[in-house]
């Protein structure tokens, strides 16, 4: 196995360095030739669908079809909503409208849409995406997110679910797609988690865990694997046994040198040993 895609976290407000994800995608489109890339995940609760559809189409065009757009609601605990004065109420309904608008803009000559939250009159974008259809990954585990994924997505991207929780969601999505006369490939179910070669007793890890729990309201063990290659591979296999086969591994570190070392360890000690892993639908 090898690195086949790069993913950028979406976070507008942060005291730590976080590059804006759509800008990073555009940069990767111009500086890489083969590798795919996506956002993990971009919050549609904070974005205008016309502008976002145009950005995605442009990036896919510039990269000759290598964009993997992924969207979610954004946490209602996120400082991005508070700082921007954006309400978290009805963000699921707004996202549903946005997804319909974006899908239509990517495939139709012009789009007229009159919804509760968005209205467009004969909107069109050119050039449209190179990929037809443009892959669309959606995150979330609520009943509404499952329905949203079944209706619009080509893949599902989990976040802080346990392997067994992920299995239940995968099954529900697969069942729901039938209702919409669609299907999602069995290998288009993924998840992501932070990775740290080290110990939970390290001060940077303690801070990382505290920040995560404050931001998400969930235990850090749900979002991170800390230890060695065996612990990371065990977590990957646990998800694979539950029907999840795509993994976004996020190295965590304190500074560029540490991040580089952690990334190299993932490639050398983890990815080199994953070729035998197989997901179980």
Predicted regions mapped to residue ranges:
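Active-site-adjacent structural elements that line small-molecule/cofactor binding pockets in enzymes
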Residues: 1-281
